[in-house]
Amino acid sequence: MLDATPENETLLEVNNIEVIYNHVILVLKGVSLSVPKGGITALLGGNGAGKTTTLKAISQLLHSERGEVTKGTIEYRGQSVSGLNPSDLVKRGVIQVMEGRHCFEHLTIEENLMTGSYTRRDGAAAVAADLEKVYEYFPRLRERRKSQAGYTSGGEQQMCAIGRALMSRPETILLDEPSMGLAPQLVEEIFGIVKDL
């Protein structure tokens, strides 16, 4: 979605990071991974293995939970993300869809989707075109676009969260447990869409 680059380029590089919470609790040690342009990378591990913490470290969301990367580096497109706030990272093309169904319950589905475009400066026509793309990926959201998100199903809320992320025009989407609590048919549908992206 951003500028054209060679397909084998590494977009995201996590090198030997260590994460500590509350200045004393070591949660991650020696975590490294590379995410190539156009690729899908999965973090696998049991409960408490540090998958969510790794994603929050990449997204710069640790500080709100008194966590910090104390060793190692995280680079996106060859530049350190250390010290960036999450909205700056979104502007650079990285967004995270959090574990669970994080929607603004009092807003409609369409209002939720539109909040994903808050960092964009490419005009209303481009935003409207991307909203149509989200509705093509998730036809149910078009049907429910005027419904308050809090009154939609868990699957619709998960689609809304992913759709909202897509509205920022990301180059890299970090999905934390995107299938949690969803019906198998819906899981297959969501993973099919992720693969198409």
Where would I find each of the regions flagged by the language model?
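A short, flexible loop at the N-terminus of ABC-type nucleotide-binding domains that lies
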Residues: 6-14, 18-30, 37, 62-67, ...
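ABC-type ATPase nucleotide-binding domains, specifically the catalytic core motifs of the NBD
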Residues: 22-23, 41, 62-65, 109-129, ...
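The feature captures the beta-strand-to-loop junction immediately N-terminal to the Walker
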Residues: 44-46
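Short coil-to-helix segment of the ABC ATPase nucleotide-binding domain corresponding to the Q-loop/switch region
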Residues: 55, 106-116, 145, 175
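Conserved ABC transporter NBD signature motif
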Residues: 69-79, 92, 126-131
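ABC ATPase signature
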Residues: 107, 151-152, 165-166
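Conserved ABC ATPase signature
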Residues: 148-152, 156
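A short, proline-enriched helix->beta-strand linker immediately N-terminal to the Walker B motif
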Residues: 167-171
